[in-house]
């Protein structure tokens, strides 16, 4: 009976997630009435809770552990709190962005509970704390206008944080990426990404002459080189690409972009020659089967898992994702593909793409160049991190050890990503307020002109 329920549950989750994904892009349509958009967003919200409930029915049936039901209730309350708080405190916030945040958290909770209950429990409490922190950020974005003047402070704090990790950080898989403070492991580079975007936007939003570009490039290079020195090459790549995109959009000069790509290619060749763990990952990427007993074991297990899942997956607890090393962090996408299926995994990618499109949409709508660059930079950080994660586990590119935002286990990544989404929400609200103020000004102007005409007659 349990196997039958697992099988039915699998197809139900795929159907509901495909429906949710369709609604993501339906909400982007321009010619849609406000009430229709509200119906779409409400249906999305219902789909989130149905998928969550369906998955935990299976988890409880397989584990026969009452604590799973308690944990399910706690997660459902958290998801409801996120939805309610954003609507209560920020009625002008983007419900689509909030829905996507909750959906990605839900998928993460489901898979982490299945893979490691202890990791899922820690992730839940971090998400709870992250929600509290992130709810403050939209207020700051709207009311603290001088934040654009603090760009040098952002750069100094970011560089110092990265230096501390390089000097006194913990080594994990060949890279120094975290610090232990009072028994808690923190990965500063996750937060420095946000500071870095604000720094670059602050430098380039007013002036893009050659001198300013050179100074900004030098400071950006310092960030990247510190990460390279600590052997966090995945993080260095994210910083590099983010800066390149922001620089090109700010200056609109193809020369800078092409030059940056050339420097990036040279740096990649240099990294291959300098770092042994980079060579190991390249070997595992080129021909993992030839080194399946050593360097290629992780990527081979990842590919086996994805292949085993097929289009519809094996169902929760019916696969063997725990054979993949570090599956809760870098390779959680493989576990999702194996047990929930290729269709579910593709829908997950599409939801991530819809988030990125939302970021770009907000960037294009912002009138002030500073906020435009911030939205674009944060969107690039998010999208490129998703690309590195999924590209690594599918053997599209060499593995970089980057986590899947909001889904993978990782406290610093989760908190930083929720803060990133909160900044975007703040920008969205700011744009809504700008639009309303412009409409009022236009209405006043029209009313004044009408009065002048009436006086003439």
Residue ranges and their predicted role:
Residues 1-17:
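Hydrophobic transmembrane alpha-helical segments in integral membrane proteins
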Residues 18-25, 83-84:
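Alpha-helical transmembrane segments
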Residues 22-40:
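Membrane-interface helix-loop junction between the first two transmembrane segments
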Residues 35-41, 120, 189, 212-215, ...:
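Membrane-interface alpha-helices at helix entry/exit sites of multi-pass transporters
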Residues 64-295, 334-392, 419, 423, ...:
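Hydrophobic alpha-helical transmembrane segments of multi-pass inner membrane proteins, especially
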Residues 306-343, 363-366, 370:
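Long extracytoplasmic/lumenal interhelical loops at the membrane interface
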Residues 389-457:
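A juxtamembrane structural motif centered on a specific transmembrane helix
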